[in-house]
Amino acid sequence: MKAILALEDGTYFEGTSFTGPGESGGEAIFNTGMTGYQEVLTDPSYTGQMVCMTYPLIGNYGITKEDIESAKVHVAAFIVKECCKHPSNWRSVMSLPEYLKEAGVMGIEGIDTRALTRHLRINGAMRGIISTEELDPEKLVAKAKQLPTMEGQNLADTVTSETCYAWQDGKPVPVDVSSGYKWSDKGPRLVLVDYGVKWNILRLLDEQGFEVLSVPSHYSEEQVRALEPDAIFLSNGPGDPAVLDQAVKNAKSYCEDLPVAGICLGHQILGQALGGKAFKLKFGHHGCNHPVMDMESKKIEISSQNHGFCVDISDCSDLKITHKNLNDETLEGFAHKTKPIIAIQFHPEAAPGPHDSCYFFARFRNLVKDATGK
C-alpha cells in the first residue's frame, strides 16, 4: 500500500505501508542502532516521535515477550528501509508488522532512510507526517506544519503510570498508598518518580537491593515525603524538560535532604533544579553506539542514548561534570560536589545497547548507603 512521508520543510519520500492504511504525525528523528527495535518501540521517551532506523533491515528477529520496556508501543510511527515479515528467532511470538498493527502504529518501508537521516542530520529534527489516505505531498506538508513542535510539550504526564506500583518479582504490581505504604525494609526505601520509566531501570535498581515504589509524575512533594523514602530516583521520559516547573521545584526540595539520582529526563530535571538550563539539540542523540567519557577515570564508554534535549550546568558552581559526549561535547552526567546527588543523560540500563555504564546503579546504591546507613 503506497504511503508518503512528508516533512515540514517540503521534503517528502514515497514508500509502502507495512501496517495497512492510516495517517500519523510527529517529530521525525533517526536512531543509529542496528538492533534493539523492540526496546525502541516500547520506550516511553519516544512518545510523539517518528523513528527512522538507519540500519537497512529491521525486524529479522521478530518480537519477544522478554524485551519490552513498557506496557505498550510509544513511537508515533516507525520508518525503515526494509521490514522483515518472516522473522527467525525461537523466542519470537509475532512479526514486527503484526506487532505494530496490533498497537495501531504506522510503519513505512521502501524509502531511502540514508537520505532521510542525512537530511535530518543537516537540517535538524522536524515535524513530519506519514499517510496512505492523503497522497498529495503539498497537502501533507501543510498538515505537518500544523503539528505541535516538541519544544513546549509536557509529554511526561501523558505516559506516567496512573497509579503507584511496586516492582516485585520482575514486574510492576499496583499498590494502594492512600493510607500510607508498608515497606518491607529489606533494603533502602526508594521512591521512583515515573516520567515514562523503562522497565530495565526498575530491574537494575531491584538488583541493587532497593525496595522500589514508583509514583506518578504528578505526585506532589508532600505526597512523596509522606511515603518516608530513603532516596529519590527521577526516571527517563519524553518531551521538553523546560516546561516541567513543578517537577523541577519538587526535585529542588528533595535535593536538600535526600540522596537523589536521575536518568535522561530525570537528569535534565535535576540539572534545572540545581541551577542549570535546558536546551534542545539539533537532531538529538538516539542509538546505542554513542561514545562518552568518564571525566574522572578518563575511560571511554559506549552508551545507549535517547534524548532531544540537554542541560547546561556551566554556571552551577556546586556541580561537577562526570561524563561528556565525545561527538558534540555536550553534558552527559554530573554530580553534586558535597551532596549524594548524581545524574546521567544517557541510559546505563541499556536495553538496547552496551552495558559499559551499568555501574551507575551500584554507585547510587553506595551513595545511599553512605548517606543513610542502609
UniProtKB/Swiss-Prot annotation:
Binding residues annotated for L-glutamine, in chain numbering: 45, 237, 239, 265, 268, 306, 308-309
InterPro entries referenced in this protein's UniProt entry, alphabetically: Anth_synth/Amidotransfase, CarbamoylP_synth_ssu, CarbamoylP_synth_ssu_N, CarbP_synth_ssu_N_sf, Class_I_gatase-like, CPSase_GATase1, GATASE
Xref: Pfam families: CPSase_sm_chain, GATase
Swiss-Prot/TrEMBL catalytic activity: hydrogencarbonate + L-glutamine + 2 ATP + H2O = carbamoyl phosphate + L-glutamate + 2 ADP + phosphate + 2 H(+)
EC number of this enzyme: 6.3.5.5
Coiled-coil zones: none
Active site location: 264, 347, 349
Domain of life: Bacteria
Keywords: Amino-acid biosynthesis, Arginine biosynthesis, ATP-binding, Glutamine amidotransferase, Ligase, Nucleotide-binding, Pyrimidine biosynthesis
GO terms of biological process kind: 'de novo' pyrimidine nucleobase biosynthetic process; 'de novo' UMP biosynthetic process; glutamine metabolic process; L-arginine biosynthetic process
ATP-binding recorded as keyword: yes
Stretches assigned to the Glutamine amidotransferase type-1 domain: 189-374
Protein family according to the UniProt entry: Belongs to the CarA family.
Complex formation: Composed of two chains; the small (or glutamine) chain promotes the hydrolysis of glutamine to ammonia, which is used by the large (or ammonia) chain to synthesize carbamoyl phosphate. Tetramer of heterodimers (alpha,beta)4.
Record's function text: Small subunit of the glutamine-dependent carbamoyl phosphate synthetase (CPSase). CPSase catalyzes the formation of carbamoyl phosphate from the ammonia moiety of glutamine, carbonate, and phosphate donated by ATP, constituting the first step of 2 biosynthetic pathways, one leading to arginine and/or urea and the other to pyrimidine nucleotides. The small subunit (glutamine amidotransferase) binds and cleaves glutamine to supply the large subunit with the substrate ammonia.
Record-given protein name: Carbamoyl phosphate synthase small chain
Organism: Maridesulfovibrio salexigens (strain ATCC 14822 / DSM 2638 / NCIMB 8403 / VKM B-1763)
